[in-house]
Amino acid sequence: MLLVQQVDQAVHSVSVISYILYLFFNHCQKMKLLLYPHGGSGNHGCEAIVRSTLKMIPTATLFSSNPDEDKRYGLDAICTLRAAQAPMSHLSLAYWKAFIRYRFGDKEAFDRTSFRSIFQEANSDSYALSIGGDNYCYGVPVFIYLVNKQLRKQGIKTILWGCSVEPEVLKGDILNDLRSYTHIFARESITYEAMKEKGIQQLSLFPDPAFQLNRTDLTLPEGFAEGNTVGINVSPMIIKHEKAKGMTLLNYRQLIRYIIATTDMQIALIPHVVWNYNDDRIPLQFLYNEFKGTGRVVLIEDHNAEELKGFISRCRFLVASRTHASIAAYSTQIPTLVMGYSVKARGIARDLFGNEEHYVLPVQSLQQGNDLLKAFQWLQTHEDEIRKHYRTFMPGYLAKTFQAGQLLQTL
């Protein structure tokens, strides 16, 4: 009889949980989610945020600066794609309305009209998620201000989703815009604490949604040894932030030489952004050309975010400069060293490990050609310790990402 009662209680508990999940996802289906701004999936970190967000809130319209690029990586299969800015003929009624408003002193009239597809899509059931992650870290985001201002004027809830912001920029127009969001989801504690200090109240701390990105395991290329390959990612962005010219690539070259000379590990060069003006394949191709004759180095071609995560997850270590390459590794419990330059790398590592020391090497700090090598040697020495920490810590951390989706539907 006792066993029967226990079974009945278990069945009842499962039924209650199933019903709660049904209510949550049924509500999510009714939500009208507008995702903006999105520069295109050639930045696979941007793509990863979109894909992971749609695991939580499955129905959305993505307003993209490059819808054709998003189609190339398959986003049209999981969401509605719209161009963020619509062309405007000089013969159109929209143009002449904007022209008249401009002549009467509305200096934003033309810009606002170019983004009209977003404003026309929005209604009282809409949630507008600003998804760039670090859009407030690269100068004054004037077009984000403009879109936010108009959406708020229409009574639309605006959400800053999975963000990092350098503490020193929290002032003036940026701070005013941040204070006007319905809610802000900070993705790491440095940003969260800095915003709290500035009096921002509508604020939560959750992991970057991309920690929940699915992985797709393609056939590994020849030269990629599963479980015994060091993944390497280099970006033009970190090279721009180096203090001594050439120091970044010198450090990567020294690291590769060390791996080839002293270990039996292979090396996979993995791009994560392939935009023409910011293409990881350029520095990676440089490294590949130098070491391809060793037979120890493979250059991974461009793939979508889930496929890239599949390659990263089968590495033994990752040394990366792109945030979402590192997130792909963290979330699959790969010991990772980040060559970083900003708050996002430091903040995420601090939340995962308690501090960023040994896990993030600021590119600005590079002074010697073996700085990266020494940091990697520490990672090697502590490999077992890091993996043990992942096993106990990561399941709970990953679970928090879906809690962000649950909070979103209550706002």
Predicted regions and their residues:
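Intrinsic-disorder-associated, low-complexity terminal segments enriched in Asp/Asn/His/Tyr and depleted
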Residues: 8, 12, 19-22, 26-27
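Low-complexity intrinsically disordered segments
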Residues: 14-17, 77
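Active-site anion-handling motifs in enzyme catalytic cores
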Residues: 25, 30-411
